[in-house]
Amino acid sequence: FDTVFVETVGVGQSETAVHSMVDFFLLIQLAGTGDELQGIKRGIMEMADGIIINKADGDNVDKAQMAAAQFRNALHLFPPTESGWSPKVLTYSGYYNIGVKEIWDMVDEYMAFTKKNGYFEYKRREQAKYWMYESINDTLRDTFYNNPAVSSMLNQTEQQVLGNEITPFIAAKRMMDLFLENISNTKLP
């Protein structure tokens, strides 16, 4: 595919995962909702390569322009991006189809900028490395919890921790020791 869009629910966790798999991270905000700069709290703005204020039409045009100005000002509070790119803030109206060309131009400009300075390839390599380790971690976690010896002792060990009979650290060590003793009985997922 030449272009793939990945939409998230906007609560913070999924954006971190998505950021590690995309070339361009676009934050879409609505004006006039009272939480224009809420993205700062979640750290999402720091990940954004571009920000668009949606529904910049009708009675909302002035609010959208004000929100765009607030975001531009807020971006100055963040350290420079790793790519060297300065994120842009644009307004957009899907209803009137205003701003689409400017958004695509921004994405194209970003891609050209990051390919020229080598960041595009660097980020792709870092993403590949990140997903390799994520896959290893997922496999290790699944292998651990699917181990018959571990699954048979986990609840009992948890109860010992909850009853203050052993510390969480001793419990973890015991469970890891049990896992390592019985790893040959476990199949990879």
Task: Enumerate the language-model features and the residues they cover.
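Short beta->alpha linker loops
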Residues: 9-10, 95, 127
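Long, well-ordered amphipathic alpha-helical subdomains in the mid-to-C-terminal portions
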Residues: 91, 102-179
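Signal for well-folded cores of large energy- and translation-related assemblies
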Residues: 19, 30, 45, 72, ...
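Gly/Ser/Thr-rich beta-alpha loop segments that engage phosphate groups in nucleotides
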Residues: 12-14, 99, 166
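A general structural signal for short secondary-structure boundary/capping elements
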Residues: 52, 75, 136-140
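Catalytic core of IPPT-family isopentenyl/dimethylallyl transferases
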Residues: 177, 183-189
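Canonical P-loop GTPase G-domain recognition
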Residues: 50, 56-116
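Phosphate/Mg2+-binding loops and adjacent switch elements
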Residues: 1-66, 70
